[in-house]
Design a protein with these regions (language model features):
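Accessory beta-strand-rich segments of carbohydrate-active enzymes
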Residues: 32, 36-40, 48, 60, ...
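Bacterial Sec-dependent N-terminal signal peptides
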Residues: 1-27
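Hydrophobic/tyrosine-rich beta-strand signature of extracellular beta-sandwich/beta-rich modules
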Residues: 165, 254, 303-305
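Surface beta-strand/loop "capping" patches
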Residues: 205-243
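Substrate-binding/catalytic cleft of secreted carbohydrate-active enzymes
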Residues: 368-371, 381-524
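N-terminal carbohydrate-binding accessory modules
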Residues: 41-45, 61, 304-374
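Substrate-binding clefts and catalytic carboxylate motifs of secreted carbohydrate-active enzymes
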Residues: 45-68, 84, 184, 188-191, ...
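Beta-strand-rich binding/interaction modules
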Residues: 132, 230-272, 279-282
């Protein structure tokens, strides 16, 4: 029997491409990042989609990790994949929970020889194991953040190679969210439900922050200070690794382009990295009369980043879209954007990433369409309830002008076993590393939603956030009634619980920013 999601994904993608929007011309095509960046030609870096043609099996099966396993009778699916067809009314935990297997056959291109290869899954639901040619390379716990594997030493050229993935979305209290699905307010729809990429580049390269595990480091980190209509200070941090056999000397070059592809800023800094080592390089640059990002004018620049050797050869490079803006929460003086009090109503909503029929396995176009419809409805704030959402949704919020509250996975559950807290802390670090360059990020919610946790937990998560984002315009929010709320500069209130808003204005702390998060259940 053929996998039923193939038909429904085709229908949905066609509908998304056929739909028109009021903001953009009919021929407009959204731009989606790949693993956090956009490709540039002639940089030695190539991105391959690994989405097509995976063999799929629902259930446990012995020996499926072995490269010689016979999978010819399995269904053929493409990613994103959500395991199964779901009815339009899919609440009540009727989705499948358990092991599923994916296997992909491919032959590496000869041009990959002498380069580095990283396999990048944007997310795999639950706990997962990844094998390449029968070798177990990765075990991961958690369903909402990237899973990245260095496959360079394990590929065989000129012959069939096999990636095998076992994904298990069964209830497991050892990692967040942790709560059994039958008591949860969302579902653990399973599978490899986001995009998968093979990233090929030279052995001297800009790293991936989610792979490197460097506090406030890895990859590219762009932060701002002293933002005004007259000028803005950019702090540019790039983490470069040298996996070649020789020391590297060269430079990092930054070029900033406006919406019309005019170069408005250029900056370079020298770089030397010994073989087998990595180095964080930092510099600052000032842009005069910048176009500032806001919900009503979501202006995006393109920041090109190149690694060049001493002969000016480009060794690696890509670009990111950045928006120059400042966000400040000033207690009783309210929210300020770009140095001025924000004059418009901050109307928003919670958003879950699932959809009728396909569960969590949305194509990028559907994430973008969701953001478009929400913005067209007059919303300016989206809360990613209750987990980091697809990179395509974050890209859309950058482009369409939606503030985003980024949440760590968690909902009304705590496990006293130390491994649970360690995995929460890891999720917080990795969601910041993934999303820190998005101008749409309004604040972070690094706390477990509506959860009773140990007294020191709240302080720990705020400390981790500030370690990972040690620059201006970084804020954390939590419920006003949450344990440890005194460590947070922003408190979420609810009119009917006596916790804030207009119902107890005399007791409000003037240093705290209060935001009425919900007027009713899940309605902002």
């Amino acid at each position: 029997m053929k996998h039923p999601l193939i038909f429904w994904k085709t229908v949905l993608i066609c509908l998304m491409l056929a739909g028109k929007t009021g903001t953009y011309a009919d021929n407009y095509q959204p731009s989606y990042s790949t693993a956090g960046f956009y490709s540039l030609s002639n940089t030695g870096r190539t991105i391959y989609s690994m989405n097509p043609a995976w063999r799929f099996h629902k259930g446990n099966i012995k020996g499926a990790e072995q490269s010689g396993f016979n999978d010819k009778s399995w269904d053929v699916v493409s990613l994103p994949d959500g395991i199964e067809y779901l009815p339009t009314e899919a609440s009540g935990c009727i989705n499948y929970q358990g092991e599923v297997w994916y296997r992909k056959h491919f032959t590496p291109e000869q041009s990959w020889k002498g380069k580095q290869q990283f396999l990048h899954f944007e997310a795999i639901m639950g706990k997962s194991k990844i094998w390449v040619n029968g070798k177990l390379l990765k075990e991961h716990f958690g369903g909402f953040l990237p899973v990245i594997v260095d496959v360079t030493p394990y590929l065989n050229y000129g012959e069939d190679n096999v990636i095998a993935v076992c994904a298990d979305n069964s209830d497991d209290p050892s990692y967040p969210p942790g709560k059994p699905q039958d008591a949860l307010d969302f579902a653990y729809f399973g599978g490899i439900y986001r995009d998968c990429w093979m990233i090929v580049h030279n052995h001297v390269f800009i790293t991936d922050p989610n792979y490197e595990n460097e506090t406030a480091g890895g990859g590219l980190f762009v932060s701002f200070d002293k933002v005004s209509e007259q000028s803005a200070l950019l702090k540019l941090d790039a983490h470069i690794r040298n996996n070649s056999e020789k020391s590297f000397s060269g430079k990092i070059v930054y070029e900033l382009y406006d919406r019309n592809d005019n170069r408005v800023l250029s900056k370079e800094t020298n770089l030397s990295v010994n073989n087998g080592k990595a180095k964080q390089s930092s510099c600052k640059a000032t842009i005069e009369t910048p176009h500032l990002w806001s919900p009503d004018s979501p202006y995006l620049y393109k920041l090109h980043v190149y690694v060049k050797d001493r002969a000016e050869n480009i060794i690696d490079g890509y670009y990111r879209r950045i928006g120059i803006r400042s966000v400040e929460f000033k207690g009783k003086d309210g929210f300020w954007l770009n140095g001025k009090p924000y004059p418009y109503p901050l109307i928003g909503a919670n958003r879950h990433q699932d959809y009728a029929v396909i569960g969590n396995a949305l194509p990028n176009s559907l994430h973008w369409r969701d953001a478009k419809k929400l913005r067209d409805a007059g919303l300016r704030v989206i809360r990613n309830a209750h987990y980091p959402q697809d990179p395509a949704f974050m890209d859309a919020c950058d482009e369409l002008g939606l503030f985003v509250i980024v949440n760590t996975p968690g909902w009304q559950f705590w496990n006293d076993e130390p491994i649970f807290a360690q995995r929460v802390f890891s999720d917080i670090r990795n969601m910041v590393r993934r999303d820190r360059n998005h101008p749409c990020v309004w604040m972070w919610e690094p706390i477990l939603n509506e959860t009773w946790y140990p007294a020191d937990f709240a302080k720990n998560v705020v400390d981790i956030l500030n370690e990972e984002y040690p620059y201006p315009y970084c804020y954390a929010g939590c419920d006003v009634t949450a344990r440890g709320h005194e460590y947070f500069p922003i408190h979420f209130t609810h009119p009917i619980n006596g916790g804030g808003g207009a119902f107890n204005t005399e007791s409000l702390d003037p240093k705290i920013s209060y935001y009425t998060r919900e007027w009713g259940d899940n309605v902002w």
